Structures are given as structure tokens and as C-alpha cells.
Curated annotation (Swiss-Prot):
Membrane-spanning residues: 47-63
Source organism of this protein record: Arabidopsis thaliana (Mouse-ear cress)
Gene this protein is translated from: CYSTM11
Record's bilayer topology term: Single-pass membrane protein
Name of the protein in question: Protein CYSTEINE-RICH TRANSMEMBRANE MODULE 11
Role, per record: Involved in resistance to abiotic stress.
A Pfam short name: CYSTM
Tissue and organ expression note: Mostly expressed in stems, siliques, leaves and flowers and, to a lower extent, in roots.
Cellular component annotations (GO), alphabetically ordered: cytoplasm; plasma membrane
Phylogenetic classification of the source organism: Eukaryota, Viridiplantae, Streptophyta, Embryophyta, Tracheophyta
Keywords for the protein's UniProt record, in alphabetical order: Cell membrane, Cytoplasm, Membrane, Transmembrane, Transmembrane helix
Length: 76
């Protein structure tokens, strides 16, 4: 009996109280509930007037520098 696998004796035979049965109509809980759905993605950001204006000005300045400079030949 000094062997570690026999550290606890077997329980005595007999009836053991198991508690009341579960209520009728309630399914047993075998699996954990599913995780909540992820939050929706944020709405797309709208470009404001000032940002669009600055982009247009930069584009115009770039085109002016590249295409209106007589030292740069774009077409033959």
C-alpha cells in the first residue's frame, strides 16, 4: 500500500447522492458558447474639400514642371 499509485483508497461501495436531475427542456451544456462576432469595420473615410484641393494643386504643379518646361522633350 506504500506504492504511490495507491495513495488514496477506493471509496466504500454504496449509494452516493447525485443531486437533482436537470429541468426538462433544458439541453445539457456540452460546448462553450461561441465567441461574439467581431465588431464591424469602420466606415470609409471621406476625402475633405481641402485635401482634394491640395492634391489637385500639387498635381497641377507637377504637370506644369514636367510638361511645360521647354528643356524637357516629351514628344518627338
Amino acid at each position: 500500500m506504500s506504492d504511490p499509485k495507491y495513495a488514496y483508497p477506493y471509496p466504500a461501495p454504496g449509494n452516493y447522492p447525485q443531486g437533482p436531475p436537470p429541468p426538462v427542456g433544458v439541453p445539457p451544456q456540452y460546448y462553450p458558447p461561441p465567441p461574439p462576432p467581431p465588431p464591424p469595420p469602420p466606415p470609409p473615410r471621406k476625402v475633405g474639400f481641402l485635401e482634394g484641393l491640395l492634391a489637385a494643386l500639387c498635381c497641377c504643379c507637377l504637370v506644369d514642371e514636367c510638361c511645360c518646361d521647354p528643356t524637357i522633350i516629351c514628344f518627338d
